[in-house]
Structures are given as C-alpha cells and as structure tokens.
Amino acid sequence: MHRRAAIQESDDEEDETYNDVVPESPSSCEDSKISKPTPKKRRNVEKRVVSVPIADVEGSKSRGEVYPPSDSWAWRKYGQKPIKGSPYPRGYYRCSSSKGCPARKQVERSRVDPSKLMITYACDHNHPFPSSSANTKSHHRSSVVLKTAKKEEEYEEEEEELTVTAAEEPPAGLDLSHVDSPLLLGGCYSEIGEFGWFYDASISSSSGSSNFLDVTLERGFSVGQEEDESLFGDLGDLPDCASVFRRGTVATEEQHRRCDFGAIPFCDSSR
C-alpha cells in the first residue's frame, strides 16, 4: 500500500511539471476569437412618403401604367415587381441627373385609395439641384418646335387654298358667256374659252369647208408662182426644140382637167 501511494504521488508531480512547461495551443485561442460573431451595423436610411393624385400626374395612361410626376430631377426606371396583397406593381427609380447619385424612389398605387400614387423617396442627392436654365431651355426648344410645326401647317393650308382658287377662277380677259359647263380635260377642269379658237375653227370648217379650201389653194398657188418667178426670172427663153416639152405638159394638164370634170357627175349619181 505504501508503494502504491508513492507511485501515484510521483505521477501527479510529472503531470504538474508537464502542464507548466507546455503552453496552450494557439488554435484554441483563434477558435475562441472566431466563435464570437461581431454584430453588423445597418445604416439607417431616411425615407419620405408622398401621396399624389393620379389626376394631377402628367402622362397617365388608361391601361393601368402610371408615370410619376416630374419633380425637376431626372429619374430612370430600373425595375418593377408585383407586391403581395396589392393588385398594382411597384416601380423602382434611381436618379440619373448625376452619375453615382444614391437617391432612389419607389412608385406604386395606394391600396386604400387607388386614385393616389404613393411615392417613397430614399437617400439624398449628392449633387446640386439642376439649374432652372436647363429646364427653361428645354421648354423653349419644345415650344419653338411646336410653333414651327403649326406655321408649316398654316402655310400648307394657304397654298392649298391658293391652288384651288386659281383652278376655279378663269383668267382675266376671256369671254365665257357662251359656255354652259366646264369640261374635264387632262385630269382638271378647263373652260371651252381656253380653246375658243379650236371651237370656232371647227364650226367654220363644218359650215364652209369648201370656201376655206378654195382660199388655201389660191394662196398656195399664188405663193408658188411668185417663187417660180423669183427663181427663174434671170433665165432666157427656151429654144424651138423645147416646144415638144411644152406640148407634152399642155396635154397632161388637159387630161387632168377632163378627169376632174368626169368625176363630178359620177359622184352626183352615187348620191
């Protein structure tokens, strides 16, 4: 028994000396540090809710999609999703006036009163308010474009009226008392007075065609004789041998005359 007690005491002393020499492992210290989670701090974002009647919103559509009212900031829509418990979706917008601006807003219809829009603003703009000169310039440009478009339409209407009146009114100096109604010639209405010379010529030709032909033939023969005299006036008389040609020409002329006189009673008999 005495020996067993001495052995146990020696073992206890060795254990104590080992614990004093060997330090604690570093892994146990790291585990103790990792096991303690550090709480993350969430930054508090101030939100501001504004309700606007849909009747006052410009650009509202009847199909259900509603655009938010203009608040002098430039916004760009980057998403939309349905809301649980509401038949209306929610639109997400971010500020596009300046690159990197954290300002955001959410637009949706109110569940209680669907005739109103609920606009929730989050974060503040990190850039100055857009100058009013830019807004006035854009407004001025739009107004100038509208004015020029209206002026062009008015000019076109005036030109159309002028063309219509010019087509309807006859030219000055024409006597159209004998005309009953206009005729459609070449796709547009024109009075007979413009072609009065043609109308008169047709009437005169139908009534006295024989007189007209006689006058033209006489003028033609007289002109031909004058030209022959002017051309052959310097030539002398032909010799006696040329009488043969003269007799031949006289004979042919007599034959033509006989044929003409013989054709007249033949035409009368056919009638």
Curated annotation (Swiss-Prot):
Domain of life: Eukaryota
Principal cellular location given in the protein's record: nucleus
Keyword annotations of the record: DNA-binding, Nucleus, Transcription, Transcription regulation
Region described as Disordered: 1-47, 130-166
DNA-binding region: 64-130
Gene3D superfamilies, alphabetized: WRKY domain
Pfam families, alphabetized: WRKY
GO cellular component: nucleus
UniProt protein name: Probable WRKY transcription factor 69
Organism field: Arabidopsis thaliana
